[in-house]
Structure formats: C-alpha cells, structure tokens
Amino acid sequence: LSPMPSTYTPRVQLPSAQIASTQLREVTDMSVLQEISPNVKNIKQSEYEVLASRASQIEKELSQGVRKPYKELIDVCWCDPHSVGVKPLTFVRQVLAACVYPQLMKSHELPLDVRQRAQWLLGRCDGGSVGMGCMCVKVSEFTTRRDGGVPSYPENIFISTGSQWAIMVDILNVLVNSEASPKTGVLTPAPCHVTSMMSITALGAAAVPYYLTEEQGWTLQVEELQRALESAKGVCNPVALYVINPGNPAGLVQSRKSMQEVIRFASEKRLFLLADEVYQDFVYGENREFVSYKRVLAEMGPPYSDTVELVSFHSTSKGFMGECGMRGGYVELVNLDPAVQKHIFKLISKSSCTPVLAQMALDLMVNPPQPGDPSYPLYNQQTQHIKNMLAQNVKTTHEVLNSLPGVISQPVEGGAFVFPRVFLPPKAIQKAEEEGMQPDTFYCVRLLEETGVLCCPGSEFEQKEGTYHIRFCITASQDIVKEVLRHLTTFHTKFMKDFS
C-alpha cells in the first residue's frame, strides 16, 4: 500500500468536542493501561531507548545537510558484524542465494559443492515444528564432533528462531509458574544482556543477579552464586541458573574448573542449568579454549552426568556466520525429565517452524566446507581473516582503553564486546542526575552527540551499583574499531577535563 499523502484528511470529520469526548471515553471505558499485563508493565525501560531515539534524529539531521563534526554515525552497540565492515562468508551467501533462486544452480559460476548443498537442502524442506528432520541430525553430528565424541541425539535437539527466542519463550515458559507465590526465580549473571532480563520479567519471574568479579577478569565465583541464592529467600523460588559463556557483555571464557564448580552447585541446589554458548567461535585469551557445558558435564561422570538438567543454546547470528537477520538457532536438552521434555516439545509444536532459510543457514554453520571441497580454500581464508582481525582488535582496544585516564578494561578472553569501567567525575554524575539520566547513559549521549559513535551504557546490563561502564562491539573491521577508539580517546579526554 502507498503511504497516505501528507494532505490526507478523513472523509467524515467529527467536531473537535466530539473527538475529545470520544478519546476520553476510550481512556476511561477501555482502561487500556489497567488491562495491560502487570508483568509487561514491570519491564524496566531500556537505557538504550534514549540513545536510539537521539541517534535516529541525528541520522535524519545528517541526511538534511545539518553540519556536524562527523559525516555519519558509527553504531557499535550490537554484534552485527556485517553492518560494521565485516564481509559475509561467500559460501554461506552463495548457498542461500541458490536456495532462494534455484536457477542459479544451472550456472557453473557457483562452485560444485555450493550447487550440491543447495540441491540437498531444497530436497529436504518438509517442515516440522522442531525443525527440518535432517537439521536436527546435522546439529547432533556437529555437537558430537565439537565435544570430542560425547554423544548427542537428534530427538534432544530442536531448531529455534534464534537463541534468545529459545531461551526466553520456549524454555522459560515451561519453567516459570506465573501463578506461583513466591514467584519463580532465575539466577542471572550481572552484568547480563538486557533482553534476558526483560524476558524473565515479562514471564512473571524474578531475575536474581549474581555479580561477576570484575577485578579478576569477570570471573564467576560459586560463593557469589550462594549469596545470590540466599538473597532470594522469601522473595522468589529460584529454579534455574543462567550462564553466558563466552560472556556478554563481559568477555570472560570459563575454565573447566569454573564450569565444574557451577555444575556441582546446580546439582546441589537442584537448579536447571541454562548455558548460553552463542559466542563459542570467538575465543582470544591465551591458554583459553571454548569447552561446552555438555562436554564438561559428561567428563565429570556420575552422578552429575546422569542427573544435572542442562539446556544449551547456539545461534547463526553470532560467530563467523554473523547472519543476524536469519534468526536461526538450536537448543540441545540433556538429562531432562521426560515429562518436562514432553511439555517443551508441546510448546514448540504449537508454533510455526523456524523460517526455512534460517534452518538452511544453520546447516551451513554446523556443516561448513571441509578440506578437499571446492569452497574450502576461500572459506578457510575468510574465517582465518576474521580470527586474525578480531585478535588484533582485542589487543588494540585493550591497549588504548587502559591508556585513558579513569578507564580500566579487563582482558577480553572471548565474545563480541568490550566492557570497560569508566570512573566518572562527581561533576559529571551530578550533571547526569540533573538531566534525569544514569551517569554512563549521560556519557554515551555526549559521546554520540560529539563524535557520532553509538555505544551502550553499562546501566543497561545490571552492573554493580556505584560502577559505570560502556559496551561496544569489537567484531567490526579493524578500520572501524580504530576509528571508534580515535573518537573515544578525543572525547574522553575532553569530557574528563570539562567535568574535573
């Protein structure tokens, strides 16, 4: 439909008094706000909304020729690598293009393995609410390889519309009893990405924060888990423990020892373990490697390997794929009570299946080109380039941030973000309060206004009270990361001077 012209007027116009009366009646009779779910009303307003609104205005002003100290915005709030200079993987885009437009398979310009994969995928589009049957098998084979032979079973895997949808809609919907008193609780890391916190609240549950130890590289301490659990007494009934490994926004990568401690804690306290592992491709720290919770659980042996209930998540949006728009992911269930698993699959089955193109992208993630395939040399070259680029970005970012006065950045061992602490001057904190903002939101708004760089404030992520942080994406091209750091250095120096 074409948009209405700006001069459009309705054919029948009501007198202004009648309009006012009608509007008043709609408010009083319908009581819209009173009818909205209290769980939805309890969702904390995002700090990012202030920044997003202003960024939208700035983009409009730039397009209208308004003069500013910069020509365009640089949005490094989110992990969307293809929007910040990282090229998509050729193999992935070629196969998806051939699936969408099969005529391309008649062209010999596409490598043979691309055409064969597209043909194979198109021949298996039979649907199914838990995903294409073959896709669950492919994911199962992938996790078995990844975990050093720890067996995986297709019947314990379902395909989802992204990892966040799977965690918050499919899994927590089963775990959370919205009518319980006290309400259901979920232990969540702090800092933690805001979508998880909002979703937990929307379901009528309580997020119980456990604070990662920033001074020790954002490590997860079992003593802190115990403190968080005790703090929930009389407030809620914790049933699940949510972990993010590698971290977001904090860039920790858990060691085997740390994961074993978490598993023992979950076992002792009878907590359902939710492992968000979407950044498993991105590990940079020395002597660090990604090991899945499923693998560590299996290696611990009985009784843990037989009893701890675990759900793990992965996504095509993250890692080398970076296909954020596909919204494809998977969930693997381990040791679930058959009665619980039945309800999870019942909930999934009531929904339409994940978009077929997203499922195809998932196949390309878990089953990439192998040595000897025509597409392998280029695929290997591109993924290696991304690895090297990110390693350099991490090194450069760490050096620059820690050279700035009043900034401390812990080493980034994995994930897609850097989350430095900013020690803001008292005058800046006072000014932020006068303007009705959190101090680090105020900092980010000023950064946006003066440099065109869009970062997220730490207050978006449940940081420890009295501390201030910013988060920005490092899964960008080296040129963009350097540009962000250049702007940030200039801005921060001036900001600290202005408010000293």
What residue ranges belong to the model's regions?
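PLP-dependent class I/II
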Residues: 3-500
